[in-house]
């Protein structure tokens, strides 16, 4: 089948999915397998549910922090930054993936393909770096509380968040030189192609996943040690005194980290295995396992808001307030619309009906 010359290594002229150009590993092309008819509807359902929960959930997180004074602190500014990283993926790449599933291939052109892959990478790496920054922030807050308020105030936190996103952009630049952002028909997505450069894939897994996870693990391990020390002593010293709000925030963000690691570990393990031995592993990885690991990673973007609601009472209460306010506004609009429609159907009240009926003498 001839490829569309205007969209090299992206999609075919007929609109059906074409295999990406596995540059650097010509012999490591995964086998083409026929798919069961239920696969596309199932993946469509996953994308639709993930997009809806991602959009609504992360919007609730952002509004909750902006509305609630108890949540409006320096630490939760990182939470807003993480929510934005998850939200952006629901606004652009996910709808394009849904179109590719429905059309059974990429039909939106090379520009959208590259842009979608870039935004996808921006969201993923931004999430990793924000989770790392949150862990460092919690570590400084709990383990070094005396210096925390000086180095993590409302004035410095926006600078740290800007640095996180600057590092995210810098981390994405090499993709344009390696040529690793292409369409992969197995997952109906324009994304990072693991076999484009085995050395670069190994570096990506190490720098964008293993190293941040090691830093986060160290920070949370130190916090756990401090928490256990504080609980073992009947009267904790000033150094070990923990506020309930700090402990609750730590547990919430630790759960976010665990969920992220579980969702992204399978895909990164596959990437590392392919980078170590591309000729053998690229052929041995089952397509079902690869697709499942990718969509599990996608699904992570909608889980953080759920974790906040389950583990943090302030977020849960603010969710209810926002949803209740939206519901009441909707009911008021519906009531006003029904009232207007009733008046239009009945027509204007005649003057005689509006006139005051005179009271007869002796009626009282």
Curated annotation (Swiss-Prot):
Record-stated family:
Belongs to the G-protein coupled receptor 1 family.
User: Which ranges make up the Cytoplasmic topological domains here?
Assistant: 64-76, 137-155, 222-253, 309-364
One GO term under biological process is: circadian rhythm
Annotated membrane-spanning segments are: 43-63, 77-97, 116-136, 156-176, 201-221, 254-274, 288-308
Q: Which UniProt keywords apply?
A: Cell membrane, Disulfide bond, G-protein coupled receptor, Glycoprotein, Membrane, Receptor, Transducer, Transmembrane, Transmembrane helix
| Disulphide bridges | 113-190
Query: Is Transmembrane among the key words of this record?
Result: yes
**By its UniProt entry, which SUPFAM superfamilies does this protein fall under?**
Family A G protein-coupled receptor-like
Q: A Gene Ontology MF term for this entry?
A: melatonin receptor activity
The family database entries (Gene3D superfamilies) matched by this protein are listed as: Rhodopsin 7-helix transmembrane proteins (1.20.1070.10)
Provide the primary localization: membrane
- Which residue ranges are recorded for the region named Disordered? 343-364
Name by which UniProt lists this protein: Melatonin receptor type 1B
Q: Report one GO cellular component.
A: plasma membrane
Q: Which residues are glycosylated?
A: 4
Short name of any one Pfam family annotated for the protein = 7tm_1
Instruction: Give the subcellular location.
Output: Cell membrane
- Residues assigned to the Extracellular compartment are 1-42, 98-115, 177-200, 275-287
What is its biological role? Answer: High affinity receptor for melatonin. The activity of this receptor is mediated by pertussis toxin sensitive G proteins that inhibits adenylate cyclase activity.
Specify residue ranges for compositional bias: Low complexity. 352-364
According to the entry, what is the taxonomic lineage of the organism? Eukaryota, Metazoa, Chordata, Craniata, Vertebrata
Membrane topology field:
Multi-pass membrane protein
């Amino acid at each position: 089948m001839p490829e569309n010359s205007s969209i090299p290594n992206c999609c075919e002229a007929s609109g059906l999915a074409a295999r990406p150009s596995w540059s650097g590993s010509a012999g490591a092309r995964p086998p083409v397998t026929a798919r069961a008819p239920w696969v596309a509807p199932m993946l469509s359902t996953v994308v639709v549910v993930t997009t809806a929960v991602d959009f609504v959930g992360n919007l609730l997180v952002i509004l909750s922090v902006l509305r609630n004074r108890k949540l409006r602190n320096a630490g939760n500014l990182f939470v807003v930054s993480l929510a934005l990283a998850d939200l952006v993926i629901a606004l652009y790449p996910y709808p394009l993936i849904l179109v590719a599933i429905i059309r059974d291939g990429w039909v939106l052109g090379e520009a959208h393909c590259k842009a979608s892959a870039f935004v996808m990478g921006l969201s993923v790496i931004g999430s990793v770096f924000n989770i790392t920054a949150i862990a460092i922030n919690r570590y400084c807050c709990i383990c070094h509380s005396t210096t925390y308020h000086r180095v993590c105030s409302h004035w410095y936190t926006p600078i740290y968040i800007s640095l996180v996103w600057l590092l995210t952009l810098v981390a994405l630049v090499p993709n344009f030189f390696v040529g690793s952002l292409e369409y992969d028909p197995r997952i109906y997505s324009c994304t990072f192609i693991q076999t484009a450069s085995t050395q670069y894939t190994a570096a990506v897994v190490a720098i964008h996943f293993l190293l941040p996870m090691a830093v986060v693990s160290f920070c949370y391990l130190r916090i756990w040690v401090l928490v256990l020390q504080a609980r073992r002593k009947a009267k904790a010293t000033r150094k070990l005194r923990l506020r309930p709000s700090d402990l609750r925030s730590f547990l919430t963000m630790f759960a976010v980290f665990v969920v992220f690691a579980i969702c992204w570990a399978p895909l990164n393990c596959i990437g590392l295995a392919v980078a170590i031995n591309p000729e053998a592993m690229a052929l041995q990885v089952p397509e079902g396992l690869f697709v499942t690991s990718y969509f599990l990673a996608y699904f992570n973007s909608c889980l953080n808001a759920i974790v906040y609601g389950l583990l943090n009472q302030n977020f849960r209460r603010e969710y209810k307030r926002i949803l209740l306010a939206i519901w009441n506004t909707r009911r008021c609009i519906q009531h006003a619309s029904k009232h207007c429609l009733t008046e239009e159907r009945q027509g204007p009240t005649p003057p005689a009906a509006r006139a005051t009926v005179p009271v007869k003498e002796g009626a009282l």
